[in-house]
Amino acid sequence: MHLLKVGTWRNNTASSWLMKFSVLWLVSQNCCRASVVWMAYMNISFHVGNHVLSELGETGVFGRSSTLKRVAGVIVPPEGKIQNACNPNTIFSRSKYSETWLALIERGGCTFTQKIKVATEKGASGVIIYNVPGTGNQVFPMFHQAFEDVVVVMIGNLKGTEIFHLIKKGVLITAVVEVGRKHIIWMNHYLVSFVIVTTATLAYFIFYHIHRLCLARIQNRRWQRLTTDLQNTFGQLQLRVVKEGDEEINPNGDSCVICFERYKPNDIVRILTCKHFFHKNCIDPWILPHGTCPICKCDILKVLGIQVVVENGTEPLQVLMSNELPETLSPSEEETNNEVSPAGTSDKVIHVEENPTSQNNDIQPHSVVEDVHPSP
């Protein structure tokens, strides 16, 4: 017995995953945009009596919208315990030793833009913002509103706290801020996430479509095998020519349950394994998609040795067979392959048996002639 497994796989066009890849590519334009960071080269001088100690280095980073230019002045923190300068009434004690001064403000409490606005309204030429406690000397480029001709720099918490405490002890501290090196940051966390997601998505689509392609090829081979087996085994069903005097053409005789027409002389009928017979041109298109007898629902294909297993979630066998084998064993082809010469007034019934093909697909039909004496 031939055991065939039948399933359908709907092949999606390549445009679906190409569209998804295009969307990912468009999203990547924002993720892959280079991030430019300008470092601040600072020369900090500590005036202690007649001594001046200087400290040089790239200790800060310019804000995103900061003016990139050189600026110098005395560092002045806000008065009072609160050093975030979020209050518009914040007071800065300007030094009498310099016309230009730089506001030293602690991060937090409000936006960077609000801090810068308060300091510039008080006359600051630049703003130095130091990070919150617990961050060490970590810095990052701040996002803030652009202020004309105002330099905005961030320094680490340790350095900012050190400067603040020295100023509170009466040490005069000045700073010269110059534009340092430019850093282009390509590999940020957005880009890394995008690369990981894109790689995983592309790998999924590639393996998914390769898998679907392999399944489609296997399915096509199964259908070809099923078609061949049906052609070979369907020939085992007998053909008969209805003649004058047969009981089928009597007024009380049966009619074909498919076309509802009575049998006439010289009609070719096919006899199923359950002994029911029908017009050959009616039963052949029926038996292929249905596989059962129209009267008793006998599984003709199973009796002939073909068992069709339909997987869960697939279309019914009737739809599959009608779609895949629309021309298989059509009435015209059957009549060509199994030509039966109707007998005129002969008293012989001709049974034409179609043997299944051998491995080389050579069909060897043979006829069996039997003497039949009509009833008086």
UniProtKB/Swiss-Prot annotation:
It is found in: Endoplasmic reticulum membrane. Residues 327-376 are annotated as: Disordered. CDD domains: PA_GRAIL_like, RING-H2_RNF128-like. GO terms for molecular function: ubiquitin protein ligase activity; zinc ion binding. Residues 355-364 have a biased composition (Polar residues). It catalyses: S-ubiquitinyl-[E2 ubiquitin-conjugating enzyme]-L-cysteine + [acceptor protein]-L-lysine = [E2 ubiquitin-conjugating enzyme]-L-cysteine + N(6)-ubiquitinyl-[acceptor protein]-L-lysine. It is a single-pass membrane protein. It holds the Pfam family zf-RING_2. InterPro entries: PA_dom_sf, PA_domain, Znf_RING, Znf_RING/FYVE/PHD. One of its GO terms (biological process) is protein autoubiquitination. A zinc finger (RING-type) spans 256-297. Pathway: Protein modification; protein ubiquitination. Auto-ubiquitinated. Residues 65-167 form the PA domain. One of its GO terms (cellular component) is Golgi apparatus. Expression is testis-specific. Keywords: Endoplasmic reticulum, Membrane, Metal-binding, Transferase, Transmembrane, Transmembrane helix, Ubl conjugation, Ubl conjugation pathway, Zinc, Zinc-finger. Its EC number is 2.3.2.27. Interacts with E3 ligase UBE2J1. PANTHER family: E3 UBIQUITIN-PROTEIN LIGASE ATL42 (PTHR46539), RING FINGER PROTEIN 128 (PTHR46539:SF27). Has E3 ubiquitin-protein ligase activity. Plays a role in male fecundity through the interaction with the E2 ubituitin-protein ligase UBE2J1. This is E3 ubiquitin-protein ligase RNF133.
